[in-house]
A protein has these predicted regions:
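Surface-exposed, low-hydrophobicity beta-strand/loop segments enriched in small/polar/acidic residues
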Residues: 2-158
Length: 158
């Protein structure tokens, strides 16, 4: 299983309002005709079991919701789980890493709008993390586009 890292997003990450700290962080998964993640460190097609590192989640962010828009579906039978891992690779006793914090075994092979399906209580990240999509079911062998929005409050480091 490979870990494929998406290059840093060139989109600006704003969202704070004068009366609160609500933020929406955006990430995009776009693949070419052979199924490889564009703008990443790999030219190989995304295989079942690959971890896609979509980008940073800041320390002190409350993870409240995720909205995933599958506008151009992946190959039939491709599924995914969406969660997070800490940048330093070391788990936290307070908030353990969770590879399916937002959802698990959800189809990415059909156009849809997906929401957080895990009923776990919102958590505040005690240290910097990475948003991770882990694929399953089948390899992707086609062009696709999936846009991910993580919604939460930037409450600050503890």
């Amino acid at each position: 299983m490979a870990t494929i890292t998406k290059n840093r997003s060139k989109l600006r990450q704003f969202g704070s309002a004068p009366y609160g700290n609500l933020s929406i962080l955006t990430y995009q998964i776009k693949t070419n005709a052979s199924g490889a993640l564009l703008d990443s460190n790999s030219t190989a097609a995304i295989a079942s079991g690959d971890k896609l590192d979509l980008g940073p989640l800041p320390e002190g962010m409350s993870l409240d919701e995720a909205i995933v828009t599958v506008s151009t579906a992946m190959t039939a039978s491709v599924t995914g789980k969406l969660g997070f891992e800490y940048e330093d690779g070391v788990d936290s006793a307070e908030v353990p890493q969770d590879d399916d914090y937002f959802f698990a075994a959800t189809t990415l092979a059909a156009a849809a709008i997906l929401r957080k399906a895990n009923t776990a209580a919102p958590v505040v990240l005690p240290k910097p993390a990475r948003l991770i999509l882990t694929t399953g079911g089948a390899a992707n062998a086609k062009a696709s586009q999936i846009d991910v929005r993580v919604i939460g409050e930037l409450v600050g480091a503890r």
